[in-house]
Amino acid sequence: MNGKLYKMMNWPEIEEIIYSDGDNPHRILGAHKVGSNYLVQAFYPDAVSVSVYVDNQKKTYEMELADEAGFYAAIVPYVEKLKYKFIIKDVDGNETTIVDPYSFEPLLEREDFIKFGSGIHYHIYEKLGAHPMRRGGVNGTQFAVWAPSAARVSVIGDFNNWDGRLCQMRRLDPIGIFEIFIPGAKENDGYQFEIKTRSGLVFKRPDPYATESKGENGIISVINKPRSIAWTDQKWMTQRRKFDKDTSSLSICEISIEAFADRHNGKTGFKEITADILEYVKNHGFDTVELMPVMKHVPEHFYHILNFFALDESNGTAEDFMNFVNTMHNEGIRVLLDWVPTFFPKASFGLSDFDGKTLYEYEDPRVGIRPMSGDLIFDYGRKEVTNFLISNALFWIENYHVDGLRTSDISRILYLDYDRKPGEWMPNIYGGNENLEALEFLKQLTENVHKNNPGVLLITKETACWPQVTDSVENGGLGFDYKWNNGWTRDFLSYMRNDPLFRAGHHDELTFSMIYCYTERFVLAFTHEELEKGLEGLYYMMPGDSYQKLANLRLALSYMMVHPGRKHIYMEPDALTIDQAVYIENMLGKLNEIYKTKAALHEADSSNDGFEWINNMAADECMISFARKSSDEKEMLIVVANMAGIEREIEVGVPADGRYTEVFNSDDVCYGGSGLLNEGKLAATRKEVDGRDYSLKLKLAAAALAIFSYVPYSEQEKKIRAIKEEEEIKKEEERRVKLEALKEKQSEEEQKLLNKLKLKYEKELAEQERAIEEKYEKIEEERIFDIVSKEAIKSISSSGKAKTKTKSGKTSGTARGKKK
């Protein structure tokens, strides 16, 4: 080896390159000025020879093999703004000319590091990842990745034979960002990051910021430029800014792309199914379509996201999805995406232990692992992680024009003890169970999305009653636009599952939601979680035979559409039979039309001024009635529902006098019902029912809901009606007076008759008493006579005996005397 060259070289540093142990190869490889020359060093393990061609000098310099591992070096005379290429010859004699990757300065600046480390680099996806570009007249790709715990990071791919010894990256900042520009790496090339830990472990990872991936589980990232199309939705994007989350209608059709695959030979690309989805959504009357995750995910596990920036390849290209959104917008359909910022799967081909240590997830498993599923929770305490998530949200909103995101259950990240037993969770710094870092992340997310994208919606699922989810951040809330009303869904479906015979005992499940209905801006949601197979799932929840199930299905959908709250239904195109599907399509189309055109059903959804119970106490009858109102009293609607399982004729109180017209009845024959309707204009009757002065007589099928529009009388009609009412009142008064006179006359006659009867009775009573007295006297006389007669006889009898005795004594004495 040339002695001068030998002395210039730093052999310990060369070993760092050969063994791929360093994090700053640029300080060794490439051209470095030494005195009046350049020391050019390169590492190509599989090369037989390497030469340097200097563009400035139009001269080639043969490089010496400094180490048999493939380390080459050469001395090149100094020249201003040196430009050079390597000419590499392999064992087969093939020559390849490449521009040295280590001849380029880094693109990331100190401001990027500061913003990223502070969690406020909201377009960091434009800096990290792979970005094809032209630098200094050279085409290639700029790579950057965040891996602070890595000892060495290399880019491997189609452009370097997937060799991790080549294209070793440099660490730019203590924050842990590695970068390199690789000439010749082009669009559609596959790549990965090869990471070596300080313990010597080497493994591969896909790019977290890749916008395209391929291979099983998306393990191969793909280089591509930012995609775009000739957007034609400017009118929609302008109109979107006017959306009022308090007063505007919102009817969401949730779909899974895979559900439409059977109609297209199993293809799930947006290119094939856009027209089908558009027709399906419009025919059912929805104004919004919500897609289950379209990001790269674990097969058959939509919410296990592997690459947050990449569209799942089964759904087609980025342009296909953009055209889908553009088409929907031009037809007046809003597009929402399901988005999962609350967890990610524990998988070696995703974000898990990305740089050899916990990076995107919490280090402590008491915080970082979901107990029930084993999924990993993002480390919201790392600003780089929250920056990743917020920039991802903005990426889909700004690049793909989507109109909003629906996040997965935030309760699982807001509460440190969610699904955890005592001792299995770690309290926050204040000893509480709130995840203060997750709380701050959610506020930062909603603030930044709304700040730059007015009209874009953020909807969330929250199941643990965290307060003020939809209140503004300024007022202490989380800043979401809407929250799923899971309590209503649970209670209502529980009520509807019961046989009508037993619903009376569950009436509170039907009415309880109105107690808390206005504490948040709610979306009433029949989601994929409850229905699984769309309306087929709801159909089989209902009691009874097929006819009764369909009637209860119509009733359930109708009730949801008239209850306060925005609407959300998970739909699958082939879930019901053809006949059932036609009926439900007709009904949902009509319900959505009423919902969107009748202000009473959405204008005051966030205020209790828009709802008034008429009768919520008829538990035994399984019936309810209420009024929906708007700022215009003429827009008032009356809703009556019969859930008893038997037909009923009822009287229902109404808040105002006027004419009422049935604008919807779920039992209409065109919806598959029996046709028991209330036809014509129904004039309110002045009769108190349900505490109201006026009422209607109605008839309802066994399981049916009816909606009545209200038309107040005109001034002329009111005058005529007032005159008629006065006449009616006058007649009523006359009838009352006559009735009272009749009652008085009847009372007098009754009194006369009573007096007459009384006199007769008293006379008869006196005669009876006299007869009784006479009879008694006679009986007494007879008794006394009898007693006297008996005594007299007895006395006479005694007297006769005494005389006989006396006469006998006198005779005896005379005789005795004569003897003397």
What are these regions (language model features)?
Residues E216-N217, S221, H401-D403, K421-A575, ...:
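Conserved alpha/beta catalytic core and glycan-binding cleft of carbohydrate-active enzymes
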Residues L278, V325, A393-I397, T446, ...:
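Non-transmembrane alpha-helical segments in soluble domains
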Residues V50, V153, V289-L291, D403-T407, ...:
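Hydrophobic residues within beta-strands of alpha/beta enzymes
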Residues L201-F203, A261-R263, H297-E300, F343-A347, ...:
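Short catalytic/ligand-binding loop motif for oxyanion handling, primarily in non-cytosolic enzymes
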Residues E212-K214, S228, Q234-E434:
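Substrate-binding/active-site clefts of carbohydrate-active enzymes
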